[in-house]
Each structure stands twice: as structure tokens, then as C-alpha cells.
Amino acid sequence: MQHLVFVYGTLRHGESNHTYLQHSQLLGQFETKPEYALYDLGAYPGLVEGHQSVHGEVYLVDEHTLAQLDILEDVPVEYRRDTIETPFGTAWIYIYQETHRLHSLIDSGDWCQRV
């Protein structure tokens, strides 16, 4: 079975964990509706509900890759999977759950443009 996944941080092209998606198909860039907030947690970002648009990419992944992403994202402890509507269809999105660690908002909503 194939799944769509929206990625917004270290899984994006050129970022440190992109190798997890090396055999997956990039469907395109996507900017969410202003329903989220993106925080810099140091080595990676955390996305939570908010009032900001977040930039990312949508990939077509297989079951094995999705399972590997769940392990990487520490589902269901650190992140949980939810769905988001994209121009490519309904995609999985990883929502950060450890809100006590949120301190540094990424104003641009783009992990790749953080300062």
C-alpha cells in the first residue's frame, strides 16, 4: 500500500534525514493553511497546532518507509500522526506532542530558512 506523507523538517530534500525517503517519490512542494506553528528544537523541528503556514514537501511512500518514519519520529510518544489535505491528496503529517519543549518559533514556517 502507498501513502502520502507531508514532511517539513529533517526529512526534506537536502536535510539530515532525507535518506529515509531516497526510494520515495517527491510529488511536490506544499505550504499548509495557517493552522500550525513550527518550532526549532535544536537538531530538528516540532510542528504543533497554531496560526502559521508551514512549508514542506509531499512524498509517496510505501508501508516499510512509513514504518521507518514512525520509528524515527518516535510515534506515538514524541510525535503522533495526523492527516492533512494537500493538492496531491490526503497525507500523513507528524504533530509534535512534547509541548513543554517549545521555545523557539520559526517565524517563516520553513525549517530550511531558519536562522
UniProtKB/Swiss-Prot annotation:
It is an enzyme of class 2 (transferase). It comes from the Bacteria. Pfam families: GGACT (PF06094). One of its GO terms (cellular component) is cytosol. Keywords: Acyltransferase, Transferase. Belongs to the gamma-glutamylcyclotransferase family. Putative gamma-glutamylcyclotransferase. This is Putative gamma-glutamylcyclotransferase VC_2546.
